[in-house]
Amino acid sequence: MSYAAIPYYIMIILTAILYYILPKKIRWIALLISSGYFYDSVSDNRVQLMIFGISILAGYTCGIFIKKGHDRQYGDIASKCILTTGIVVSVLPLVVSKCGDLLLVSVLHKSSAGWILPVGLSFYSMQTVAYLTDIYHGKIEPQKNILKYTLFITFFPLIIQGPISRYDQLGEQLFEGHSYDDRQIMRGIQLILWGWELKYLIADKAAIFVNAVFDNYQIYSGLFILIAGILYSIQLYTDFLSCVTISQGVSELFGIKLTDNFRHPYFSVSIKEFWRRWHMSLSAWLRDYVYIPLGGNRRGKIRKYMNLIITFAVSGLWHGGRWKYIFWGLLHAFYQIAGEILEKPVNFILEKASLPKGSKMRKFVEMVFTSFLVMNAWIIFRAESLKAGAKMIRSMFSMFNPWILFDNSLFRLGLCQKEFEVLFLAVLLLTAVSALQEKGIKIREWFNRQNMLIRWTIYLCSIWIIWIFGTYGFGFNSADFIYGGF
């Protein structure tokens, strides 16, 4: 059962009915039942469920005993040992998976036995580490009810692709029991519809062209690679954003508000800013639980740069046990270090080129350049291997073939002209919406102030557009959410 499947939404409707029928104090039980059912339905075997159950039990038990250690029943040394044990048990399957993949792919050119690993491992492991660490530092109290703790870890809109939620942000929202609110329900539906549009009108369409080029990269060069790189940058963003948006919408049906995971990352004027806008829950987790514990920027520039390299290497390994992912992470570390070292000379050159800091043209140039750097890293990320990614980037610069824009070559890679037009218009709409939000305009508030006729006309038109021009429009099926594979 995936977030794009009809049974998923049938489950949501049944869950919502049960949730609002139950007394407020026990409404969280409806979420727990559905979360358990959903996780069981997406798991391939009982071994996965057993590993997942051990992780939940370890996280819950260690949280209780860490707190008791702070209350001087066991002492601080014991608390540290318990914290370490809880973290090791939580992340060991993840480390074994990623490092095992890295070893087997490098040496034997085979993949590890990923079939035994629990679904959502990369996300709930980080959530557990944050939970235990925050208890140790006294930021939160441990959850004493194991069923409530289980709900925190397994909450079904989050378990596959996040966002990675902290207990102090999510915990009480899950357990308090929210009142039924028509407006809240409609706000949730708005987000779900917007998520569908991002997925079916942009991400899935872009995937067709992207797959055609990346799967046969040896025969393409020049603008073919550039366009595929741009479209993959858009595909990955809208695919992940759509899943998070749908998750936020589903959660709002129950009165639960999830943290945002993106803030228009391709409007960034530097790589540093990009990581403040991209996958924000992961960026915050890496900052708080890897970068800062390593010393952050408090111990001189050399140590700061080493900490950045380690942090981004961890980020790369988190995405997968392949050298291409680690190189992708290290490349972003290099971008940040180079950006900081070269900031003054670059600023001097741009000032001399009549591009003063703060000017619109300067911002545009920096946005384009940052997006180009990010796109090159995404090519490595998407390619079948590090070697293939490097070859694609070389091929992109090896030939200038502008004629493909006019001889219909682009329309022979899975997308006809009409599909390209739909994709272009959908990206244009996303860009316009993002630009308005960037200026502080709250589109949903404006929308909710309109009369019922206008609102329902937009709802029905959105569904019609998705139905005609999205998944069903030209005979192709929805692809899996990309980040579900990490």
Where are these regions (language model features)?
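Membrane-embedded transmembrane alpha-helical bundles that form the catalytic cores
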Residues: 1-431, 435-485
